[in-house]
Swiss-Prot record:
Catalyzes the condensation of isopentenyl diphosphate (IPP) with allylic pyrophosphates generating different type of terpenoids. Homodimer. The lineage of its organism: Bacteria, Bacillati, Bacillota, Bacilli, Bacillales. Keywords: Magnesium, Metal-binding, Transferase. It comes from Bacillus cereus (strain ATCC 10987 / NRS 248). Substrate binds at residues 39-43, 51, 55, 83-85, 87, 89, 206, 212-214. Pfam families: Prenyltransf (PF01255). Its EC number is 2.5.1.-. InterPro entries: UPP_synth-like, UPP_synth-like_CS, UPP_synth-like_sf. GO terms for cellular component: cytosol. Binds 2 magnesium ions per subunit. It comes from the Bacteria. One of its GO terms (biological process) is polyprenol biosynthetic process. This is Isoprenyl transferase.
Length: 258
């Protein structure tokens, strides 16, 4: 049975998946979902395939999950695509990862435009290869007027780096007399982050069974709900995302209260 491993779907054997989707949509849908897409390499290794095969398969899942998140009326979907630490990986793998945005957007951009999806990128883009930057810039330019789901790629992104950069810019504004020490607040610091125009993630998902944050949106996930799964990213499905959201809907978010 499709939903046997999904606790909130138990007892609904005669219910279609589409009906379950509509039931979940009656509840509160997180405005911003962030996903640490982990496990591509291990997925490939288990199948005696090269690691890049796992990344290619993971790209197909991005397409599927983006469409489904849009269907659920999620406002922002942030995907951790490449961290500042990932440069330590073998050059062949890094080179392939830098080609993925071109491949992904080359085939999927028309559908993103049709789905009214807006593409954005956070991260230090100056270190990215020119062909990678151009692919992302083209997608952002061609979707900038779209008003549906914001598909936000974290590419060459590290949260500590982001926070340091934000503080540096704030100090520069202080030197220029634009900021006073007494004006500094959480809201002000947030305004200097790469996500300043976005709501903080309400739900953080990590695949592959790892229980860590990996330098991802450390400031922004202060009050996020976490959802971990042992499933590798290439095996992640719409059912998994629906289950994560259903779990989210059953939690009591107190934000430090009682």
């Amino acid at each position: 049975m499709m939903f046997k491993n999904f606790p909130f779907f138990k007892g609904k054997k005669d219910t279609s998946f589409d009906h379950l989707v509509e039931e979940v949509k009656k509840g509160y849908i997180p405005e911003h979902i962030a996903i640490i897409m982990d496990g591509n390499g291990r997925w490939a290794k288990r199948r005696a395939m090269p690691r890049i095969a796992g990344h290619h398969e993971g790209m197909q899942v991005v397409k599927k999950i983006t469409k489904f998140a849009s269907k659920l009326n999620v406002k922002v979907l942030t995907l951790y695509a490449f961290s500042t630490e990932n440069w330590k990986r073998p050059k062949k793998e890094v080179d392939y990862l830098m080609k993925l945005p071109e491949e992904f957007l080359g085939t999927f951009l028309p559908e993103l435009i049709e789905e009214n999806v807006q593409v954005r990128v956070i991260g230090q883009q100056d270190r990215l290869p020119t062909h990678t930057r151009r692919a992302m810039e083209k997608a952002m330019e061609e979707t900038k007027e779209n008003t549906g789901l914001i598909l936000n790629f974290a590419l060459n992104y590290g949260s500590r780096d982001e926070i340091v950069s934000a503080v540096q810019h704030m100090m520069k504004d202080r030197e220029e007399g634009k900021v006073r020490v007494e004006d500094v607040s959480e809201e002000m610091l947030s305004s200097y982050l790469m996500t300043s125009s976005l709501p903080d993630p309400e739900l953080l998902i990590r695949t592959s069974g790892e229980l860590r944050i990996s330098n991802f949106m450390l400031w922004q996930i202060a009050y996020s709900e976490f959802w971990f799964t042992d499933v590798y990213w290439p095996d992640f499905t719409e059912e998994h995302l629906l289950n994560a959201i259903t779990d989210f809907q059953h939690r009591g978010r107190r934000f430090g209260g009682v």
